[in-house]
């Protein structure tokens, strides 16, 4: 079904079964597969491929060369009825690739709202991305990666499968992210090590100086204490019940995960 207000270049191929919403714009030489849903006001520039069981949210804009909704690159996957869901008002720049999920792991790759994907970034199968995230050029997310709201990943950084990146974390360019990154953490290097807190991001998010000071103290207690990271975090939790960002860090550490925790020290992982 194609809405009457949609504007589609005659050189583009729209397969039967595709749903094209109101005021959608599709430029030249695009391919839209039969199981694709483009919500209202989506804009697709030239030479874009959207295939698979893919839904693109209202107002999202996709630039030339992007391939959205291709099968998982997992060697053991089954693509039957798997999906990719992209939220509203995302910007997907040149050459970006996003894959559908795998049957074995829930079947869905999910991307939230207001995200920015710069050129040649990659979102693999079964990833879960929140809102207001930035993936800079050539960022690579392996399968099953979780990225929370307002995280920023610098150019060329690579994230190991099943890794979690917490809210408003900052990943430096060319970093290798092999382990979970706490909310508000900054990670740099290869191997990636924590280098402190994303204080600039916390300030921009409206946290006052006293709150940031408490979160810094919490960070030191976690990573400079005598016990393991998880033991240190559990021991101080009651001190921070009234400090939301610190409590978020502590709960992130306590949560079950397939990966260990990034730290400032190569020898401490959990």
UniProtKB/Swiss-Prot annotation:
Main localization category: cytoplasm
Family, per entry: Belongs to the transferase hexapeptide repeat family. LpxA subfamily.
GO-annotated cellular components: cytoplasm; membrane
Localization (cell): Cytoplasm
Reaction catalysed by this enzyme: a (3R)-hydroxyacyl-[ACP] + UDP-N-acetyl-alpha-D-glucosamine = a UDP-3-O-[(3R)-3-hydroxyacyl]-N-acetyl-alpha-D-glucosamine + holo-[ACP]
Designated name of the protein: Acyl-[acyl-carrier-protein]--UDP-N-acetylglucosamine O-acyltransferase
PANTHER family, sorted: ACYL-[ACYL-CARRIER-PROTEIN]--UDP-N-ACETYLGLUCOSAMINE O-ACYLTRANSFERASE, ACYL-[ACYL-CARRIER-PROTEIN]--UDP-N-ACETYLGLUCOSAMINE O-ACYLTRANSFERASE, MITOCHONDRIAL-RELATED
HAMAP family: LpxA
Pathway assigned to this chain's UniProt record: Glycolipid biosynthesis; lipid IV(A) biosynthesis; lipid IV(A) from (3R)-3-hydroxytetradecanoyl-[acyl-carrier-protein] and UDP-N-acetyl-alpha-D-glucosamine: step 1/6
The organism of origin for this protein: Sinorhizobium medicae (strain WSM419) (Ensifer medicae)
Pfam families associated with the record: Acetyltransf_11, Hexapep
GO MF annotation terms: acyl-[acyl-carrier-protein]-UDP-N-acetylglucosamine O-acyltransferase activity
Enzyme class: transferase
Residues making up the signal peptide according to the UniProt record: none
Enzyme Commission number(s): 2.3.1.129
Function: Involved in the biosynthesis of lipid A, a phosphorylated glycolipid that anchors the lipopolysaccharide to the outer membrane of the cell.
């Amino acid at each position: 079904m194609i809405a009457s207000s949609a504007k589609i270049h005659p050189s583009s191929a729209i397969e039967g079964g595709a749903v094209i919403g109101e005021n959608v714009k599709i430029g030249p030489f695009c391919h839209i597969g039969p199981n694709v849903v483009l919500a209202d006001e989506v804009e697709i520039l030239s030479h874009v491929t959207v295939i698979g069981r893919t839904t693109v949210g209202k107002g999202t804009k996709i630039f030339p060369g992007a391939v959205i909704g291709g099968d998982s690159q997992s060697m053991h996957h089954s693509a039957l009825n798997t999906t990719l869901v992209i939220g509203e008002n995302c910007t997907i720049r040149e050459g970006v690739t996003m894959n559908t999920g795998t049957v074995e792991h829930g079947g869905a790759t999910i991307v939230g709202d207001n995200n920015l994907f710069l050129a040649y970034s990659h979102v693999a199968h079964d990833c879960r991305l929140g809102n207001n995230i930035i993936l800079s050029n050539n960022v690579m997310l392996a399968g099953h990666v979780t990225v929370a709201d307002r995280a920023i990943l610098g150019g060329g950084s690579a994230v190991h499968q099943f890794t979690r990146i917490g809210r408003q974390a900052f990943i430096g360019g060319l970093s290798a992210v092999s382990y979970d990154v706490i909310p508000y953490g900054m990670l740099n290097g290869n191997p990636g090590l924590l280098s402190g807190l994303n204080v600039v991001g916390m300030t921009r998010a409206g946290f006052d100086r006293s709150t940031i000071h408490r979160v810094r103290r919490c960070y030191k207690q976690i990573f400079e204490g005598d016990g393991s990271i998880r033991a240190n975090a559990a021991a101080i939790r009651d001190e921070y019940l009234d400090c939301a960002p610190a409590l978020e860090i502590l709960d992130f550490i306590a949560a079950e995960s397939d990966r260990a925790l990034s730290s400032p020290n190569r020898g401490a992982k959990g």
